A protein has these predicted regions:
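Extended recognition/assembly regions associated with phosphoester-bond processing machinery
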Residues: 1-76, 80-216
């Protein structure tokens, strides 16, 4: 598997092609913004109809990353579900699939703005996780260091094509959204530009993760 290795606060990390973050020394795999159940929520709220396959596609990619890394610890970095009702409304196949992935693992759900509070589906539920020298939370805090977050679904454009990306500088890493149908925020948006140092990189996801200077 091609990865992009980098260091944050002295911790050796790697971005996987899928957008997952792998911390081999801790056996920790981190994914952000799965947004499971998005098509169901859209249908429930009489919004645009989306093909009802995004949960299966997301879980299939997550299963592949778990198998590739053998991760004993999984951190879901918030907005794992599109809303609380989506967590309760997974169909039996998806619920069973998720249960198989969680079995025998230290599974940690970080609260997001779409899914605050305990979800009642097992695992550990936290507002943030401190695993020195890193802190994992859903939304970046200005001035924080050694921080891994998500929320913004960052994307960057290269050769006319926009792709999900990891944003990283000496203080923080902002993960791309892992889920299907998640959209994204351009890296030159003021919300992201204000968080990242001027020498930040955008690492484009894909079969061969590719670092470029963060577009501003």
């Amino acid at each position: 598997m091609n990865t992009y290795p980098f260091s944050l606060a002295g911790a050796p990390l790697a971005l996987l092609p899928s957008g997952a973050l792998w911390w081999a020394d801790e056996g920790l795999l981190c994914v952000s913004d799965l947004h499971l159940g998005r098509s169901e929520r859209y249908a429930r709220n009489a919004g645009a109809l989306l093909p009802p396959y995004e949960t299966r596609d997301t879980l299939a990619r997550l299963e592949a990353d778990i198998e590739a890394t053998g991760a004993p610890t999984l951190v879901c970095l918030g907005d794992s579900f599109d809303d609380i009702a989506s967590a309760r409304g997974l169909d039996d196949d998806a619920s069973d699939w998720l249960a198989r992935l969680k079995a025998g693992r230290n599974w940690i759900w970080i609260e997001g703005n779409h899914d605050p509070g305990p979800l009642g589906i097992g695992g550990t539920h936290l507002a943030a996780l401190r695993r020195a020298p890193l802190t994992f939370r859903h939304i970046a805090k200005p001035g924080a260091t050694g921080e891994v977050s998500g929320h913004y679904h960052p994307k960057a454009r290269l050769a006319g094509r926009s792709r999900p990306c990891l944003l990283v500088d000496r203080d923080r890493a902002i993960l791309p959204a892992y889920g299907t149908y998640t959209g994204g925020l351009r890296s030159d948006d003021a919300a992201l530009a204000s968080l990242m140092q001027t020498d930040a990189l955008a690492v484009l996801t894909g079969p061969q993760p590719r670092p470029i200077p963060m577009p501003r």
